[in-house]
């Protein structure tokens, strides 16, 4: 089988080497972007008079027919043609004859391939952002629904201070909002056209790079042809943003795993998002959440693999860069799957509000409020901290909690305590008094919910 680049060679490729260098198995998913790029390129060639207008029209029609063949499952993919790009070009020549060979005028696979990847990344950033917004919408819905539910807030995985469940859920909304912004930032670097850079040095033909960039919807063009064909920063940035987003999903998944355990009992997974045991009939395992957590390492690995491929490459193009696609595709596919399944899991999650309320009543998470009570009575905070610490120790030694103490016991620690201490350290008071901006007081959480709803409303148009 004659290679499109075979003029220089005197013998065919070794079959093992041919299979080793082929990227068709994974880059065939770029067919839409490849055809889009080729149509823009051939329109420019015809417009500039570089090839006959009639040939440009025949090539465009042939490319559209090839796209239809691929989508109908009728395209004859051939591994010996190495990749999706040469498969399409070879098929074009078969369909329309020698005129198809004009398509690659003033173009190299170096700028062709990276143009395809730029287009794919732009498409996928938009898809990921939609999924992020969907998950944010579900978090917002559940936070509204659970407004008023009080639970322990944690530091060091120890009960720290009471918070609203809605406040806790909204923390993840804002993490995802930063993720959305990171993807938007990554889009700016992806939204630049390398098409027309050639192999590395540009071309001798009078091409119009601004025309092809506009045809493809790019915001601009690379100003340096060597940078254009060798840049993979935009891939690294996208995958880095994906890794950070996946880290947030992993943190949420970890909390759901813990909260669904008997030891916490704060939530129950819907049966559709849990599995059983092959030996223990009683088990209901949070496998979906565990897999979201586990797949985080996979995306981190994709990011590290990309950085390692790039770290020692001199300018300009090297076939090492073929290794970028599988890592990119895997990271994006994994993130999209995790965002989708997490949205469904959260939408169907059952919250045990009573169990959360019981937990917050039988702990010392109101100790800070007891100290604040003394400070408001005029005691310096450090002294109040010491007094409350001793009261906590007293309770621990006697199997009590602060709310169990009699007024006489309170007064043994400080004469400033009055009967209003019981109201001051009630969980509902602890929550409602935290009215600082961004705090867990109901009014502040309602403000968060309104702001979040406004953000999503603007985004959804």
From Swiss-Prot:
GO molecular function: argininosuccinate lyase activity
Enzyme class: lyase
Superkingdom of the source species: Bacteria
Keywords: Amino-acid biosynthesis, Arginine biosynthesis, Cytoplasm, Lyase
Enzyme nomenclature, EC number: 4.3.2.1
Involved pathway(s): Amino-acid biosynthesis; L-arginine biosynthesis; L-arginine from L-ornithine and carbamoyl phosphate: step 3/3
Compartmental location: Cytoplasm
HAMAP family, per database record: Arg_succ_lyase (MF_00006)
Family indicated by similarity: Belongs to the lyase 1 family. Argininosuccinate lyase subfamily.
Name of the protein in question: Argininosuccinate lyase
Source species: Symbiobacterium thermophilum (strain DSM 24528 / JCM 14929 / IAM 14863 / T)
Gene that produces this protein: argH
